[in-house]
Amino acid sequence: MPIHIAFCVNDAYIPYITVTLMSIAENHKDDEVIIHIFSDYISQKQKLRLDKVVNPYPNLTLSIQMVDDSALRGLKDTWTIYTWYRVLLPLYLSNEIHRVLYLDADTIVASNIRELFFMDMSDKAIACVIDPESFNSETYSRLKYDSSKKYVCAGVMLMNLDYWREKDLSKTIIKWGYDHNDIIRFPDQDTINYLCRDSKIVLPLRYGIMDYFFKTDSFYQEPYAQELRDCIEHPAIIHYAGMNPWKRELATSLMQDEWEKYNKMLPHPVKKEYITKGWNLVKMYIWNILHPSPKTSTLTRGDVLNKLNSCQ
């Protein structure tokens, strides 16, 4: 059976997901993988860019589908409407596809994920890693559910499509989003967490590694200590949440080298961009020369392991 992986992006984000695609291709050479890309428009130029990545790998198949997002207009889109597209996947994918792994564009698949994809999901809608918001009491008071149910990150989400279809979850999520626009902070992620609060699996951290884990003391204690060690020693999926690895000012992740490795393998590597541009970039450069900041230490994998060992 093939592994199905989905992305929901606009045309401008295609270059970034080519890095993710390269990481998938390199770590699944013996697996049939079908890549589903959902968008409202993809240019011929970007389609060719995708083909150049996928075509050298005969076990990879690329499927591109256009989405009618009229049902989503009016929903809160703090970042982009495309994040809502993932709730439509059960409606757009064939009923013969029983599950799909949704990935944000700022991810790397650092090892084979067959075991994850075919895990038991009986009577569960989703499987995700815990989100930093799970430790924020305001999250639960705002969404009105118990903290024991946890709050997960939808940026890496294994979806049980049979469950979604049986419960008509896509339509329920969209309706709840409209009805609760006033309390939503993280649009579809809030909605998914609330409606799947009793039907989600919390995955080991290695399946959605975020830098937040390494910078938070609670993850160096049980029940997370061994999972944090596995993030360093056996990384599976890296999620550069809030640290876009293609933005020079944000490319400071502990796992930045993994993104760089796969980017270099591409026929057309992604060129890093500055958030600050033009004259503002020149002014920032001059300011940094005239007002040098004291050097701050950068967290390394060794630092994480040393801290874990000292906490034992």
Features from the language model and the residues they span:
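A glycosyltransferase accessory/donor-loop signature
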Residues: M1-I3, V9, E166-Q312
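A structural signal for isolated positions on well-ordered beta-strands in alpha/beta enzyme cores
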Residues: H4-A6, I34-H36, S63
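Active-site beta-to-alpha loop of glycosyltransferases that engages the nucleotide-sugar donor
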Residues: V9-P15
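Short, acidic, metal-binding catalytic loop of nucleotide-sugar glycosyltransferases
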Residues: S23-E32
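Short internal beta-strands
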Residues: I34-Y41, C128-V129
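Active-site-proximal specificity loops/subdomain of glycosyltransferases
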Residues: K45-Y92
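GT-A fold catalytic core of metal-dependent nucleotide-sugar glycosyltransferases
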Residues: I64, D68, Y82-F135, Y151, ...
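A short, conserved beta-to-alpha structural element at the edge of catalytic cores
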Residues: I126-D146, T252-Q256
